[in-house]
């Protein structure tokens, strides 16, 4: 009986080393319920005015918009969500997915404002208005949503400082299936541009843009919510989607190499054998 532990250890050492040589991997693949009849696209305004904030160290409009987009995506776990940016045009950044890791990574690392920091502080030049919400007409025209998505939601995260929208926007959003549209506005009259650390005198928020945003929303049959009403916007999105058919979508989890752990485990019986030999 005393030889049994020795025999077991002699068998375990080559077995564990052989297993380690096979480089085993633990694959944490999971499945998630995904709606087959619904999709959403989140469009974030990346015009320079989205850098405005309440102070030099306060969060910018874009930072708050990214956070709100993350909150809204997590509130719709079964809805595939795509991401795009808006300035003079609309540019997709991520295809619709229910994998929150993808949307979180794109929101954190990819969506920003080009030319955010000028080479020298602007003191006399009034920023040019470049944002055009009329560019949203490309969403229904360019088939952002597949035919299978009968429930379509567009959420636009913007400060509403936009050029007037032309008739093309209204025509585009008359297509069927209809695209439900929510505008989530990030704006305050006291905000300024602090890109260089001091307020740029060339930029002062204009309250008149609120009416222009309301006009654009009316043209597409949408609704406008302020960032303080994020919960109301979330409820509106949830009510719009309701319930529907789903399918199980597999998602690859983290792949963990087990070779180091198996190799380490092989040293346990080996250490036992060395200990017995020295007795």
Where do the protein language model's features map onto the residues?
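A conserved amphipathic helix/loop scaffold
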Residues: 205, 235-250
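Extracytoplasmic/secreted cell-surface and envelope-processing proteins
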Residues: 51-54, 91-94, 162-167, 191-194, ...
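DG-centered beta-turn motif at the end of beta-strands
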Residues: 17, 45-47, 65, 83-88, ...
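Membrane-embedded segments
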Residues: 23-150
């Amino acid at each position: 009986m005393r030889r049994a532990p020795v025999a077991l250890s002699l068998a375990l050492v080559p077995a564990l080393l052989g297993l380690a040589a096979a480089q085993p991997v633990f694959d944490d693949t999971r499945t998630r319920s995904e709606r087959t009849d619904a999709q959403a696209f989140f469009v974030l305004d990346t015009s320079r005015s989205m850098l405005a904030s309440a102070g030099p160290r306060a969060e910018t409009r874009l930072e708050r918009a990214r956070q709100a987009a993350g909150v809204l995506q997590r509130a719709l776990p079964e809805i595939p969500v795509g991401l795009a940016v808006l300035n003079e045009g609309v540019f997709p950044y991520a295809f619709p997915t229910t994998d929150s890791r993808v949307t979180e990574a794109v929101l954190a690392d990819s969506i920003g404002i080009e030319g955010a920091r000028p080479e020298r502080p602007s003191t006399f030049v009034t920023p040019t208005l470049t944002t055009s919400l009329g560019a949203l007409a490309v969403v229904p025209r360019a088939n952002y949503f597949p035919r299978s998505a009968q429930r379509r939601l567009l959420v636009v995260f913007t400060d509403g400082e936009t050029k007037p929208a032309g008739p093309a926007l209204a025509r585009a959003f008359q297509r069927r299936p209809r695209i439900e549209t929510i505008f989530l506005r990030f704006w305050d009259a006291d905000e300024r541009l602090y890109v260089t650390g001091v307020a740029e005198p060339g930029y002062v928020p204009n309250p008149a843009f609120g009416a222009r945003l309301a006009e654009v929303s009316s043209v597409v049959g949408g609704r406008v919510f302020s960032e303080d009403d994020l919960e109301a916007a979330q409820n509106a999105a949830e009510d719009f989607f309701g319930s529907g058919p789903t399918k199980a979508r597999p998602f690859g989890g983290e792949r963990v190499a087990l070779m180091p752990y198996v190799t380490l485990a092989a040293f346990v019986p080996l250490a036992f054998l060395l200990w017995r030999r020295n007795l």
